[in-house]
Amino acid sequence: MTIMRKSHPLMKMVNHAFIDLPAPSNISGWWNFGSLLGLCLIIQIASGLFLAMHYTSDTLTAFSSVAHICRDVNYGWLIRYIHANGASLFFVCLYLHIGRGIYYGSYLYKETWNVGIILLFLTMATAFMGYVLPWGQMSFWGATVITNLLSAIPYIGTDLVEWIWGGFSVDKATLTRFFAFHFILPFIIAAAAMVHLLFLHETGSNNPLGIPSDSDKIPFHPYYTTKDLLGVMILLALFLTFVLFFPDLLGDPDNYSPANPLNTPPHIKPEWYFLFAYAILRSIPNKLGGVIALVLSILVLAMFPILHTANQRSMMFRPISQFLFWMLVSDLAILTWIGGQPVEPPFIMIGQIASILYFSIILILMPLAGLIENKMLKW
């Protein structure tokens, strides 16, 4: 008689994905971030559900309802800060997960990688709309500035913006629809994540050496369930430190002022995890050009499988590519810093140089490095 997890239709699926899944024996801690992202999504959906029970998506009461959650709801402050900082945690894990994929050549699993890019876009859209909901100053002006970018689209731009707004400015209709989309998108993300896993399990996981691991596989459980559990413990410890000791560290003080269409904040900027893209957007003086650069800053990830020139998959034994990878990480750190600075010298020039460097490293220097390394290894 076969054991239930191998015969029951539902448990069989779980078994193949998380228990008897053959996994490479040498995957490192960098492979923990997939499961950690799943945990982040669960935390966000759970905390978001409880917040939605008390939140009202009306311009007159939205700000007050968030204050009510923090003051009057049992542990409302905790749920609110878990949700707000959970978004930051989500993006930390997301960026580390993508960085891992670039470093070890995981992008050569094209289907998995492309679904991952779609997941990134969906997550960014969800986070943006969630930031609008508290209806503080930065919520309102952030929504106004970012949605207004669509007016740069030739011919249909203005109509498109007014259609998204549901009027002639960011108002009640905008807030209501953003709440509706913010509620539904995480479930779409969850479905897309399952597709992401489906494609991954078609090929099996990559490993740090970037070589086939079919000859040396181990079961996912207990080895990687235990390893993931360690990652979960570390992550939750760091997360709760933030939530309980520094809940407002990553937020904007302006968002503690109710939205006022008659008073523009001195520096309109998004949350820290969008600053690199915001810096790229601002580095181009032309509105349409900036919007295109903004979209391309994420879409450029789709070029990695196409521009992979090296005969080795992983960067583990490719020092020139390693140098360029860390240069890219440093460049993104500079862009993040610039995105939070006012538009004035010397920040304008630094932002423009960093933006050019960002695209140059990915589109020109990394493929060249791969070819040079092939020559050096006489491949």
UniProtKB/Swiss-Prot annotation:
PROSITE patterns: CYTB_CTER (PS51003), CYTB_NTER (PS51002)
Transmembrane segments: 33-53, 77-98, 113-133, 178-198, 226-246, 288-308, 320-340, 347-367
CC annotations in GO: mitochondrial inner membrane; respiratory chain complex III
Topology with respect to the bilayer: Multi-pass membrane protein
Protein residues bound to heme b b566: 97, 196
Pfam families: Cytochrom_B_C, Cytochrome_B
Record PANTHER family: CYTOCHROME B
Cofactor(s) needed by this chain: heme b
MF terms in GO: metal ion binding; ubiquinol-cytochrome-c reductase activity
Chief subcellular location: mitochondrion
Name of the protein: Cytochrome b
Binding positions for heme b b562 per the UniProt entry: 83, 182
Leftover remarks: Heme 1 (or BL or b562) is low-potential and absorbs at about 562 nm, and heme 2 (or BH or b566) is high-potential and absorbs at about 566 nm.
Cross-referenced InterPro entries: Cyt_b/b6_C, Cyt_b/b6_C_sf, Cyt_b/b6_N, Cytb/b6-like_sf, Cytochrome_b, Cytochrome_b_C_euk/bac, Cytochrome_b_N_euk/bac, Di-haem_cyt_TM
Keyword annotations: Electron transport, Heme, Iron, Membrane, Metal-binding, Mitochondrion, Mitochondrion inner membrane, Respiratory chain, Transmembrane, Transmembrane helix, Transport, Ubiquinone
UniProt: a ubiquinone binding residues: 201
Family of the protein in this entry: Belongs to the cytochrome b family.
Highest taxon above the source species: Eukaryota
Function field: Component of the ubiquinol-cytochrome c reductase complex (complex III or cytochrome b-c1 complex) that is part of the mitochondrial respiratory chain. The b-c1 complex mediates electron transfer from ubiquinol to cytochrome c. Contributes to the generation of a proton gradient across the mitochondrial membrane that is then used for ATP synthesis.
GO biological process: mitochondrial electron transport, ubiquinol to cytochrome c
Organism, as annotated: Chaetodipus hispidus (Hispid pocket mouse)
Assembly, per entry: The cytochrome bc1 complex contains 11 subunits: 3 respiratory subunits (MT-CYB, CYC1 and UQCRFS1), 2 core proteins (UQCRC1 and UQCRC2) and 6 low-molecular weight proteins (UQCRH/QCR6, UQCRB/QCR7, UQCRQ/QCR8, UQCR10/QCR9, UQCR11/QCR10 and a cleavage product of UQCRFS1). This cytochrome bc1 complex then forms a dimer.
Cofactor note: Binds 2 heme b groups non-covalently.
Lineage: Eukaryota, Metazoa, Chordata, Craniata, Vertebrata
Bridged cysteine pairs (disulfide): none
Cell compartment(s), UniProt: Mitochondrion inner membrane
